[in-house]
């Protein structure tokens, strides 16, 4: 049985989601699927965060250095002429063989983009060829532009590419992908194995991550920092329109000037995950009491509303699966939307 490489042409598009979800789905079918990430990026510690998360979720006993044998960091380019380059592929091969020995197959997660690592001869295409893998491309929805990416990847990987999975597809575009994109690719010899719709739960961001990204400090509610926020809204309207505006989105973060108590209190009347108060303001006791009663974290940041909104824009819009509360949802989405049995047959 062939092992599988999950490739992508864009970071944050669903590789970890699909990799972990496929491992769970294959295990439910009696296949002992393990996880492997040939090349990673240094995270909070010395190991790749995705690999650490997957190992925890899947209960893997392998040494982290085998699960992700090459970890890139800021010094990788300067070291590219030495040991990093010369021994990197050997470490990948050795780690792969040790991990595979404990499983029926490995689902291998690629870097953010399939051509990343090429300067070390460790791109997705290099690894797929060296390890004799089959590949599945994750295509994050981006309109017709993604058809270029899929066709180009097919040209590079050729018969090693089993097909594509469309990911993060908005509900309004599902029909277009199913009835236009997928048939077009089929006519060009590229199989579509499923369409993962955009999912608010998987896109949600922990309040703690929001505070960290904005360099904010909790005024109240740090104990609710694991609450997941599904979207964000900017409070910059008149008070009479605030309530109806904030009611549009549940489980949101509201970014508002710290001196706009009228808007802050309006937001607290609606389902809100956190308040981000800009301008270094400390809110009144009334606000703090209402926030505590509603179990809403209040975060103060030094910058203005525009800067805070820009910081949140970079946080939202990427699939984020490093919370265990999302694992069941990942498994459900893969079972409902991915042709796992057809994929398994193609790996035989």
Which positions does each model-derived feature cover?
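Generic secondary-structure signature for well-ordered alpha-helical cores
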Residues: 27-31, 41, 56-63, 97-101, ...
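N-terminal phosphate/diphosphate-binding loop that engages ATP/GTP or pyrophosphate donors
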Residues: 3-91, 95-98, 181-184
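Structural motif
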Residues: 3-5, 32-34, 52, 104-106, ...
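Flexible, charged surface loops at secondary-structure boundaries
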Residues: 99-102, 243-252, 267-271
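Phosphate-binding/switch loop-helix module in NTP-utilizing enzymes
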Residues: 78-120, 125-129
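Non-catalytic interface/targeting segments
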Residues: 110, 195-257, 313-348
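Conserved catalytic-core segment of NTP-binding enzymes
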Residues: 111-194, 259-322
């Amino acid at each position: 049985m062939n092992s599988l490489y999950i490739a992508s042409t864009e970071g944050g598009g669903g590789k970890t989601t699909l990799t972990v979800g496929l491992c769970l789905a294959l295990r439910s079918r009696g296949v002992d699927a393990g996880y492997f990430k040939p090349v990673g990026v240094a995270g909070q510690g010395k190991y790749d965060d995705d690999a650490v998360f997957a190992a925890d979720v899947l209960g893997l006993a392998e040494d982290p250095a085998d699960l992700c044998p090459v970890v890139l960091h800021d010094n990788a380019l300067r070291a590219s002429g030495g040991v990093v380059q010369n021994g990197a592929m050997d470490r990948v091969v050795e780690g792969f063989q040790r991990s595979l020995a404990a499983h029926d197959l490995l689902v291998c997660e690629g870097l953010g983009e399939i051509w990343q690592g090429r300067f070390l001869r460790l791109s997705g295409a290099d690894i797929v060829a060296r390890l004799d893998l089959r590949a599945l491309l994750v295509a994050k929805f981006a309109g017709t532009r993604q058809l270029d990416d899929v066709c180009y990847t097919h040209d590079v990987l050729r018969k090693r590419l089993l097909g594509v999975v469309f990911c993060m597809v908005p509900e309004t575009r599902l029909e277009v992908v199913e009835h236009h994109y997928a048939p077009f690719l089929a006519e060009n010899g590229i199989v579509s194995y499923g369409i993962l719709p955009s999912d608010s739960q998987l896109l949600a961001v922990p309040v703690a991550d929001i505070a960290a990204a904005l360099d904010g400090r909790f005024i109240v509610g740090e104990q609710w920092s694991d609450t997941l926020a599904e979207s964000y809204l900017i409070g910059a309207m008149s008070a009479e329109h605030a309530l109806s505006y904030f009611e549009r989105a549940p489980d949101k973060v509201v970014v508002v000037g710290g001196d706009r108590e009228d808007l802050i209190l309006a937001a607290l009347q609606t389902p809100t995950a956190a308040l981000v108060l800009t301008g270094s303001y400390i809110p009144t006791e009334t606000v703090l009491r209402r926030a505590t009663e509603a179990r809403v974290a209040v975060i103060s940041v030094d910058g203005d509303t525009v800067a805070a909104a820009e910081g949140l824009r970079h946080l939202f819009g990427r699939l984020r699966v490093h919370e265990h509360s999302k694992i069941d949802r990942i498994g459900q989405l893969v079972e409902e939307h991915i042709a796992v049995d057809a994929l398994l047959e193609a790996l035989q």
